[in-house]
Protein backbone atom coordinates (compact mmCIF):
# COMPACT_ATOMS: atom_id res chain seq x y z
CA UNK A 1 0.00 0.00 0.00
CA UNK A 2 2.77 2.44 0.94
CA UNK A 3 4.68 1.62 -2.26
CA UNK A 4 1.57 2.29 -4.35
CA UNK A 5 0.96 5.67 -2.68
CA UNK A 6 4.62 6.62 -3.14
CA UNK A 7 4.45 5.69 -6.83
CA UNK A 8 1.25 7.67 -7.36
CA UNK A 9 2.70 10.67 -5.56
CA UNK A 10 5.84 10.51 -7.70
CA UNK A 11 3.76 10.39 -10.88
CA UNK A 12 1.67 13.35 -9.73
CA UNK A 13 4.79 15.43 -9.05
CA UNK A 14 6.29 14.48 -12.42
CA UNK A 15 3.03 15.44 -14.17
CA UNK A 16 2.96 18.79 -12.38
CA UNK A 17 6.56 19.51 -13.44
CA UNK A 18 5.80 18.66 -17.08
CA UNK A 19 2.64 20.79 -17.02
CA UNK A 20 4.57 23.72 -15.54
CA UNK A 21 7.23 23.50 -18.24
CA UNK A 22 4.65 23.09 -21.02
CA UNK A 23 2.67 26.19 -19.99
CA UNK A 24 5.57 28.53 -19.27
CA UNK A 25 6.79 31.05 -21.80
CA UNK A 26 10.45 32.06 -21.67
CA UNK A 27 11.92 35.23 -23.12
CA UNK A 28 15.68 35.66 -23.19
CA UNK A 29 17.21 38.93 -24.34
CA UNK A 30 20.87 39.91 -24.37
CA UNK A 31 23.08 42.71 -25.56
CA UNK A 32 26.82 42.97 -25.85
CA UNK A 33 28.97 46.05 -26.30
CA UNK A 34 32.72 46.45 -26.23
CA UNK A 35 32.56 47.47 -22.57
CA UNK A 36 29.57 45.56 -21.17
CA UNK A 37 27.19 42.60 -21.30
CA UNK A 38 23.53 42.60 -20.27
CA UNK A 39 20.78 39.99 -20.40
CA UNK A 40 17.37 39.16 -19.02
CA UNK A 41 15.58 35.87 -18.51
CA UNK A 42 11.84 36.38 -18.12
CA UNK A 43 9.25 33.72 -17.40
CA UNK A 44 5.58 34.27 -18.16
CA UNK A 45 2.58 32.10 -17.22
CA UNK A 46 4.52 30.33 -14.48
CA UNK A 47 2.92 29.18 -11.24
CA UNK A 48 3.43 31.59 -8.36
CA UNK A 49 6.60 30.90 -6.42
CA UNK A 50 10.31 31.65 -6.52
CA UNK A 51 12.52 31.04 -9.55
CA UNK A 52 16.17 31.47 -10.43
CA UNK A 53 17.90 31.67 -13.79
CA UNK A 54 21.17 30.43 -15.20
CA UNK A 55 22.70 32.39 -18.06
CA UNK A 56 25.45 30.79 -20.14
CA UNK A 57 27.52 32.02 -23.05
CA UNK A 58 30.45 29.99 -24.29
CA UNK A 59 32.22 28.67 -21.19
CA UNK A 60 30.76 31.45 -19.00
CA UNK A 61 27.91 30.79 -16.59
CA UNK A 62 26.09 32.97 -14.03
CA UNK A 63 23.33 31.97 -11.63
CA UNK A 64 20.88 34.46 -10.16
CA UNK A 65 19.34 34.40 -6.73
CA UNK A 66 15.73 33.22 -6.51
CA UNK A 67 13.16 35.87 -7.38
CA UNK A 68 9.42 35.83 -6.61
CA UNK A 69 6.73 35.86 -9.25
CA UNK A 70 4.44 38.84 -9.65
CA UNK A 71 1.15 37.87 -11.26
CA UNK A 72 2.65 34.63 -12.63
CA UNK A 73 5.66 36.40 -14.16
CA UNK A 74 9.28 36.56 -13.09
CA UNK A 75 11.97 38.86 -14.50
CA UNK A 76 15.63 38.16 -13.81
CA UNK A 77 18.32 40.57 -14.98
CA UNK A 78 22.05 40.07 -15.50
CA UNK A 79 24.47 42.93 -16.15
CA UNK A 80 28.03 44.16 -15.99
CA UNK A 81 26.82 47.73 -15.38
CA UNK A 82 27.27 48.84 -11.75
CA UNK A 83 24.00 50.80 -11.86
CA UNK A 84 22.06 47.66 -12.88
CA UNK A 85 23.84 45.53 -10.28
CA UNK A 86 22.93 48.06 -7.58
CA UNK A 87 19.28 47.65 -8.66
CA UNK A 88 19.47 43.88 -8.18
CA UNK A 89 20.86 42.47 -11.43
CA UNK A 90 23.11 39.43 -11.17
CA UNK A 91 26.69 40.59 -11.86
CA UNK A 92 28.41 39.64 -15.12
CA UNK A 93 31.89 40.33 -16.43
CA UNK A 94 31.92 42.95 -19.20
CA UNK A 95 33.11 40.26 -21.65
CA UNK A 96 30.66 37.58 -20.40
CA UNK A 97 28.79 37.18 -23.70
CA UNK A 98 30.90 35.41 -26.30
CA UNK A 99 30.10 34.37 -29.84
CA UNK A 100 27.10 36.68 -29.97
CA UNK A 101 24.72 34.29 -28.25
CA UNK A 102 23.51 33.27 -24.82
CA UNK A 103 21.30 30.61 -23.27
CA UNK A 104 18.89 31.35 -20.46
CA UNK A 105 17.38 28.63 -18.30
CA UNK A 106 14.65 29.15 -15.73
CA UNK A 107 14.40 26.88 -12.68
CA UNK A 108 12.01 26.54 -9.78
CA UNK A 109 13.51 27.29 -6.39
CA UNK A 110 13.61 23.50 -5.85
CA UNK A 111 15.85 23.12 -8.92
CA UNK A 112 13.37 21.79 -11.51
CA UNK A 113 14.03 23.10 -15.02
CA UNK A 114 11.04 25.08 -16.29
CA UNK A 115 12.31 26.20 -19.71
CA UNK A 116 15.49 27.00 -21.61
CA UNK A 117 16.16 29.11 -24.69
CA UNK A 118 19.21 30.12 -26.74
CA UNK A 119 19.16 33.46 -28.55
CA UNK A 120 21.39 35.66 -30.68
CA UNK A 121 22.44 38.74 -28.73
CA UNK A 122 22.14 42.26 -29.97
CA UNK A 123 25.64 43.53 -30.75
CA UNK A 124 26.24 47.26 -30.48
What are these regions (language model features)?
Residues 35-37, 70-91:
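Aromatic sugar-binding surface patches on proteins
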Residues 60-81, 118-122:
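Solvent-exposed serine/threonine-rich low-complexity stretches and specific carbohydrate-binding patches
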Amino acid sequence: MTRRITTLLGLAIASLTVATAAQAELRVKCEVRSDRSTASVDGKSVPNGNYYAVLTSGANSATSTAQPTIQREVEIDFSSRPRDINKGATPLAADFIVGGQATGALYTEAGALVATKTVACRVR
